[in-house]
């Protein structure tokens, strides 16, 4: 595909993210489409570690946070319904991912990239590397508050980044 499109420096890897994550060092662009559950976190971690100037991820499956989600009292009546708890876990997971990207020097945004009539998994996390330094301390405090609010003990990307 790279040859056919004239992008001779474009390289595709097939396999587990961890198996190819250290091969080339730096990366200009990281794209992860529908990497299941914590595979999205592995991909984001690789992009951050490689210093990618642009990271695009379309997450899929959010079991890690769903299993831990402990609704705060104010949300218990709403999140006692399985489908609502599942959707909340998806939003919280992707919100944490965007926040972690911001903590680690990226400007992140989350948006719908394809109509929900085609797929329910239609969120895109986009992040570009900041050119100016920033103070991550206030963002780290927000992360701690968010994790505590939902009773979350761990999140894969946070662990990989040492947060």
PLM ranges: what are they?
Residues 1-163:
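Class I S-adenosyl-L-methionine
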